[in-house]
Amino acid sequence: MLQIYNSLTRKKEFFKPDHPPQINIYVCGPTVYNHLHLGNTRPLIFFDTVKRYLEMLKFKVYYVVNITDIDDKIIETSLKNQVLEKDLANKYIKSFNNLLETLNIQTINFKPQATQYINSMILYIQTLLDQGFAYFTDQGIYFRVSKITDYGKLKKQDLSQLKQNVRKQLDPQKEFPGDFILWKKTSQGITYPSPWFAGRPGWHTECATMIEQLFKLPLDIHGGGTDLKFPHHENEIAQTHAHSHQKLANFFMHVERLDYQNQKMSKSLGNIIWCKDLLKQYNPCIIKFLILSTHYRKPINFSYDLMEQTQQKYKKITYFLTKNNFYLKVNHFFCQTLDQDIMQLFHQLMQDDFATHKVIDLMEQIIKRAHQTQILDKLSQFQNSLLLILNTLVIAIPFNKPTKKDLQTYFLWQDARKCRDFIQADILRKQLLDKGFI
């Protein structure tokens, strides 16, 4: 039975959706003021695999990834580049969708944009005001954190520490340093009319509102990068409790960071590996292979040496499938059966909190076992099992498949060897070697 590590309880728990076979998943997506870097892409690759596997288990998964298309960073970038916020956002939404297509991430059912829900956000905030969970200052409307008794539970955030680590540009009218903006009063950048004053919604309110608009609470799974635990997901939890008196999600899943040069990859640090640039050098499946080779709750320290090692592992699987498939073809052997022991182990690994790194190791073991036998039935089962696993991980291996001419070349080569026509045999052998068949 599937077990998932729940960030909220800090332990693995058996996963049971509220309304099987339906599963609802919401993952926080990009703020579209730039292209996505490799760290941004890691959760998207991982949750794509999560959905594929859940569907393999016959669940019906509705998977939403939001797009934050209005935000201070978008406004800052648009002013700097002298373009409209909408045009800037649309440019990077297109870049985001192109990246998803290139990486073959096709499982997202809906990608809501924050600007499509402004009216709903206004109504949401008004409810919080009416219930005493929000208050006005000269700078906007804030959420009153003190009214949430277990605020900080997701990351075990110490509120006394929060007082000490207050932002420099603190609104002096805030009741508590941890109170967060629901509606920002501003004249800079795009603003929206409201019953109170022109402004725009806070990021945490955007997601909380969209979740309630799109799903019946609680979510089965709420996901994102580990950096979103606090304050973003914590503030979503607080707002949902205040607004609807419900819990936001049964399971929280957080994907660890991706480091570069032993530092967290981030735009603010400038140590960015843009996915669009990496894709100019590597097959998209090698990038996915790299991401899935480390458990999602462990950080990845990216390096180009690591990329090269991953590429060699990918090639090893490609070579095996090319040769093994050819061997089965020339022996006129075909079956659709799987190796049940391998598949049982695969499911054990995936149902243990999606241990994709161990599944990668399992694939290497399949190849090792295949090299130790010439039994056609076993080789076919190994190949079928490996291909099914790769398909679940959404890693395509475009291995060479023999044509009729290739098969004829093989049999001519065998005949030349029997006739001791070594010159012709060498010519034919080279043709097969060049295609990776032998």
From Swiss-Prot:
- Name where it's found: Cytoplasm
A Pfam family for this UniProt protein?
tRNA-synt_1e
User: How are cofactors bound according to the entry's free-text note?
Assistant: Binds 1 zinc ion per subunit.
Chain ranges passing through the membrane: none
Its main subcellular localisation, reduced to a broad class, is cytoplasm
What family is this? Answer: Belongs to the class-I aminoacyl-tRNA synthetase family.
Task: Specify the protein name.
Answer: Cysteine--tRNA ligase
* Taxonomic source organism: Aster yellows witches'-broom phytoplasma (strain AYWB)
